[in-house]
């Protein structure tokens, strides 16, 4: 049974269409990574429209967009990765160029891995929401 993780809900200062269009092309994600981020120096990213490959320390994580529901949901599944997982990005239109956004992650983690990583995964998902909220407020 997969472990389910869910981020907090954030309000992003963009329409659901604008936000959806950013995430619907995985090449956009590679351009969002800060070039001077020290913690990512030894990590490589390669993307096309539907696929993203992340390599670090001999570990490869490959993902593919498997479902797009225009302006409301994008589903991304792992492909040939050490851990099987699914990420769902949810976009809820609030009107007035505002979108309620949250992320869900379902991962095949054993009990020990869930205990070790569960809180870190939730914190990571919440950090993504916080970052998007801050960035949208500055634009």
Where do the PLM segments sit?
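Beta-strand/loop substructures that line and gate deep hydrophobic ligand-binding cavities in soluble
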Residues: 79-130
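A short, structured loop/turn motif at beta-sheet edges
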Residues: 13-16, 66-71, 90-100
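Hydrophobic ligand-binding cavity/cleft-lining segments
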Residues: 1-46
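Short, highly charged C-terminal tails/helix-capping segments
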Residues: 36-40, 130-139
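Short, surface-exposed coil-to-beta transition loops
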Residues: 5-7, 59-62, 83-88
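Hydrophobic-ligand-binding modules of eukaryotic lipid transfer/binding families
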Residues: 1-10, 94, 98, 134, ...
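Hydrophobic pocket/interface hotspot
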Residues: 19-29, 65, 76, 101-103, ...
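Glycine-rich portal/gate segments that line the openings of hydrophobic small-molecule binding cavities
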Residues: 31, 40-82, 138-139
